[in-house]
Every structure is written in structure tokens, then in C-alpha cells.
């Protein structure tokens, strides 16, 4: 689609302007109908753009998804495929960074008696993840809607499926203006 191509071109420009073209060059190829079947499963990708919707509110639910050697780490298993990388001279540094990140996440996971210390340890792991470019945050989606439902009356859960419950919604058959929702 044209939207997908436009988005890819914008991202290529952002990468070029931010990181330069020496080490990161976005090569835009043809559109595919199934990223999983045509790109991720045959391991033809260099990176991916996707999101994660947490099942529960602990940082482990997010940060555990890119840990090394963990079969339940979705991103590691399905997207980065880091668990399949064979250690060579060329890959040793990358694998060591993933192992260090995993050790930081495991250390945070082990803290169960002090929530502040647990979150501080997860913050350290997250900072390592981003600083070492194991994951690079690149976009955030905000959905705009024309609605007859007051969004302030809806459940606003940060994770799980609670946001889908139609309970105690306030509605207006004429819709809402920006002023009414301010």
C-alpha cells in the first residue's frame, strides 16, 4: 500500500538523519501480504516494527520478551531470532550483549520483596537494552476516532483485555465535540 511505502520512506529518512548511513541502511523492498510467512519465518528481515501488549503490569512482561535463551521470550524466538544465532567471531559481541541484558532481567526477576528495587533493576535492564540497540523504539501510535462514547467513562487499563468491556460507558447520540471532552 502507499501508506506502508510512505511510512517506510519516512523511517529510512529518520534512520539516515539520526544514525547515518555507514552502519544502518534501510533497504525498502516490495510489499508482502504476510510478514510472518514471507519475511520473519524464513528469516529475511534485518529488523521489524511491532508492538507488545502486556498481559500483566510487571515490567518483566515487556523486558522478558527479548531475553536470550528463553523459549517463552516472544521477540527473541519469533522476531530477532537471537537464540538461533551461531556464535562466531563476528557474532560474539552481539551474543554477549544479549547475555548481559538477560542477566540484568534475571536479576530484576529475582527481586520479589522490594518493589522499588525491582523496578530500579528493570530500569537498568531497559536502559541497557536501548543503549546497546538491542531494541530501538521508533514509533508510537495514537488512534483518533469520531465517537459517540465519552472515552473518559471507559475503563483505562494499561494491560490485559479490560479495555474491551462495555461497562458504565457514557454515550451521546449526537457525538462529542473537543470542547465537551476537554
Give, region by region, the residue ranges found by the protein language model:
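Short, glycine-/Ser/Thr-/acidic-enriched flexible segments
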Residues: 1, 52-55, 143-145
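Bilobed "Venus flytrap"/periplasmic-binding protein-like clamshell domains
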Residues: 1-13
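Short, solvent-exposed loop/turn elements at domain surfaces
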Residues: 6, 57, 146-149
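Composition- and surface-driven signal marking solvent-exposed, interaction-prone regions
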Residues: 8-11, 28-29, 63, 120-124, ...
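A general structural signal for alpha-helical elements within enzymatic catalytic domains
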Residues: 13-20, 130
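Periplasmic binding protein-like
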Residues: 17-77, 121
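Short, solvent-exposed loop/beta-turn-alpha elements that line the ligand-binding surface or hinge
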Residues: 37-43, 64-106, 140-182
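Bilobed periplasmic-binding protein-like "clamshell/Venus-flytrap" ligand-binding domains
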Residues: 98-149
